Amino acid sequence: MSGLEPTPEQFAALAARPADAPVVMVNLLKFHPESGLQRYQQYGRDVAPHLERVGATVRYAGGAPSVVIGEGERPWWDAILIVEYPSPQAFIDMVTNQEYLEVHEHRAAALDRGDLISTSSWSIAPE
């Protein structure tokens, strides 16, 4: 089962990434059965100014109703949220800000499970 907070090792690995490269965070979200979605939507509204403050952009947010390739009819997660930050430090600055930590309580209360995957982009265009 996934934790809802990063381990010190996970946080250190993110901080060690190239400082001048954007980082795209893929959130796989499993909501608590009772009011989890509504609480997460409240978190989304409350976190928007914090994302703006660090220059982050929501690239995609949506449900995960079915599996096309893979096992089972549905994935384990209910929704996907993809957010691009201008750098790893921008993400770190946001999540360590005291005002953000107050908003973060809504996220923790909404989720039964939440995997956060830090990715880097690469081109698939032909050379």
What do the predicted segments below correspond to?
Residues 1-79, 86-93, 120-127:
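Short S/T/G/P-rich N-terminal loop/turn motif that feeds into the first structured element of a domain
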Residues 93-99:
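Short amphipathic alpha-helices in soluble, non-transmembrane regions
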Residues 55-58, 99, 115:
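Secondary-structure boundary/capping signal
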Residues 105-127:
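Charge-dense polyanion-binding interfaces
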Residues 80-83, 99:
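Hydrophobic alpha-helical segments of small multi-pass membrane proteins
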